[in-house]
Amino acid sequence: MYAIIETGGKQLKVQEGQEIYIEKLDANEGDTVTFDKVLFVGGETVKIGNPTVEGATVTAKVQKHGRQKKIIVFKYKAKKNYRRKQGHRQPYTKVVIEKINA
């Protein structure tokens, strides 16, 4: 059984036992979080949401918080000695999908 959930402005296909990296959640490590925006549930029977599947939830356990690899944003203007360098590390939360309730 799998589901498509929406979290952090992104849609993710998840299965039970899967580890996923999502946008940072306001939860402590070891906490259980519930995703209510379930757009699709697949398996033996298929449930398609309009826009979400009513009564369907996905529960997950927070494993850790962290920051992704640094990306460099560099902009310049040719021949004008104008250079700006900026780095960014996006925070994330690693969760393990425990149960899909449909």
UniProtKB/Swiss-Prot annotation:
Disulfide feature: none
InterPro entries to which the protein is assigned, alphabetical = bL21-like (IPR028909), bL21-like_sf (IPR036164), Ribosomal_bL21 (IPR001787), Ribosomal_bL21_CS (IPR018258)
Biological process GO annotation list? translation
Gene Ontology molecular function: any one: structural constituent of ribosome
Keyword Cytoplasm assigned to the entry: answer is no
Cellular component terms (Gene Ontology)? cytoplasm; ribonucleoprotein complex; ribosome
- The source's superkingdom equals Bacteria
Keyword terms: Ribonucleoprotein, Ribosomal protein, RNA-binding, rRNA-binding
- Complex and partners: Part of the 50S ribosomal subunit. Contacts protein L20.
Q: Which family does it belong to?
A: Belongs to the bacterial ribosomal protein bL21 family.
Q: What does this protein do?
A: This protein binds to 23S rRNA in the presence of protein L20.
Protein's name in the database: Large ribosomal subunit protein bL21
Protein species of origin: Geobacillus thermodenitrificans (strain NG80-2)
